[in-house]
């Protein structure tokens, strides 16, 4: 995992991993980094989706992120964005990372084949703007990757994934990066 390498090499002192602001809890990242005090894992997800937390089956068990927020099935834009904003802004202020790694999963979208949240295209776009603007305005570098998203129509999926790139471009222009 690249975040561990960055910490071990001294490239950063503290790293925030927004591994999951999508429909699934970031259990794998939480497990890998659970003993690493210099890393903070944040997950805002649908509480009734994989991984389901079956104890006794380690490969399906939930590992706790440093901050886990499980949302109800069917959560829409307003509640989702409010949760993301509160958690992200609070964590940026309290943990004060040198770098944010953000996995911009789009399986929160209302038309996603496997998601259980109901986030509109506008809500998805606002999430990307919120995450990137929050980091850039605090002068915290952010690295974004696309992830999560299930649709039989590749064009629809690509359109959703493009939201994070549009938000990054807008921040680049706004802040003259």
Each language-model region and where it sits:
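Conserved alpha-helical scaffold segments that buttress catalytic/binding sites
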Residues: 1-133, 137, 162-166
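Metal-dependent de-N-acetylase/amidase catalytic core
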Residues: 123-177
């Amino acid at each position: 995992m690249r975040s561990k390498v960055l910490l071990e090499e001294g490239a950063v002192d503290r790293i925030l991993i927004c591994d999951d602001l999508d429909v699934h809890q970031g259990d794998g990242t939480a497990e890998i980094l659970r003993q690493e005090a210099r890393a903070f894992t944040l997950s805002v997800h649908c509480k009734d989706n994989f991984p389901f937390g079956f104890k006794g089956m380690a490969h399906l068990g939930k590992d706790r992120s440093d901050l886990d927020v499980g949302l109800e099935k069917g959560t829409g834009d307003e509640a989702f964005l409010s949760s993301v904003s509160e958690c992200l802004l609070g964590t940026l202020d309290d943990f004060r990372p040198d770098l944010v790694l953000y996995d911009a999963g789009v399986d929160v979208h209302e038309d996603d084949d496997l998601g259980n949240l109901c986030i509109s295209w506008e809500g998805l776009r606002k999430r990307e703007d919120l995450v990137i603007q929050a980091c850039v305005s605090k002068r915290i570098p952010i690295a974004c990757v696309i992830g999560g998203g299930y649709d039989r129509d590749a064009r629809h999926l690509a359109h959703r994934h493009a939201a994070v790139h549009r938000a990054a471009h807008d921040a680049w222009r706004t802040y003259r990066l």
